[in-house]
Structures are given as structure tokens and as C-alpha cells.
Amino acid sequence: MNSVFRSTARCLRSATWQYKTAHKNGELSVGRARLMCSSAGQKNLEEMVKKDKVVVFMKGTPAQPMCGFSNAVVQILRMHGVDNYASYNVLDDQDVRQGIKTFSNWPTIPQVFFNGEFVGGCDILLQMHQSGDLVEELQKLGIRSALLDQEKESK
């Protein structure tokens, strides 16, 4: 995967949150908190992200996405001919919805995983698609992008 995407994801995925508290005397105190998954929840999420070569946590289902970003991820995968992947509707389970955000240290849904490794959300997948990196990543998974066949036909 392109190192720019990895470093961007690493920078954005910090699970340490800084907060400020205002006291009655007007002073502000700063604190930090780290979000943690329970070990049972983390193990379950680890199993979920490794269920298939491509796993998507989204709002809705591939047949009926419930937000524009989830729909964009489905459409990008569909353009590449990736129709066989595990998907989880986070609207069905609040624990999964919050747990996956903590697990990946990524604040938004949808979330895409390749071979159990967090790739990113809609923005990262779109950048990978536009740059051609997604074709390469799919090849590493043993998935031939349908866009390669379209390129051959157009020549």
C-alpha cells in the first residue's frame, strides 16, 4: 500500500483524546483519555475483520447502503468486480459500531479491511482507486480488478 496512505492513517488513528475541563474558579485543566475495547469485544472484532479477504463495516448493506460514504465504498468495490466480501451493518449493533471505531482507531464509518488489516474509510479507498493503488492491493489479495479487463478491451 502506498506509504502516504499508511502514514496518513497512522496520524489520524490516534486513540488518545485530549479534553479540557472548566472549573468554577475559571481555571482550565487538560486531561487525556485512551479508549479501550474489552478483550472479549476486541477478540470478536479481530475475528470479524479476518472473516474474508475484504471486510467492510458500513451503514446499511451492499444492496441497500444507508449513507453516501458507504454507498461510495460499495460502488468502488463493484467497479473493480469485488462482489464477494464480508460486510457488517453497524446500524444493527451499537456495540459493533463503537467497537470498530476503537479497534481501528478510526472515527468514521465505513471502514475497509484487507486480510484483517485496516485500509481506511471512503476517502482512502477513493484515493487508492484514483491513483491505481487499489488495483495493486487487490492483486496482493489474489483478486483481479475488473478495471484491468476494461483497459484491455478499450485498446
Curated annotation (Swiss-Prot):
Phenotype reported upon loss of the gene: Lethal between 7 and 10 dpf. Embryos show hypochromia, and circulating blood cells are pale due to a defect in hemoglobin biosynthesis.
Residues engaged in binding glutathione: 59, 97-101, 109, 122-123
Metal-binding keyword on record: yes
Subcellular location, principal: mitochondrion
Pfam families linked to this entry: Glutaredoxin (PF00462)
Subunit structure: Homodimer.
GO MF terms held by the record: 2 iron, 2 sulfur cluster binding; metal ion binding
Binding site for [2Fe-2S] cluster: 67
Function, as annotated: Monothiol glutaredoxin involved in mitochondrial iron-sulfur (Fe/S) cluster transfer. Receives iron-sulfur clusters from scaffold protein ISCU and mediates their transfer to apoproteins, to the 4Fe/FS cluster biosynthesis machinery, or export from mitochondrion. Required for normal hemoglobin biosynthesis.
Alphabetical UniProt keywords: 2Fe-2S, Iron, Iron-sulfur, Metal-binding, Mitochondrion, Redox-active center, Transit peptide
Compartments, as annotated in UniProt: Mitochondrion
Protein name: Glutaredoxin-related protein 5, mitochondrial
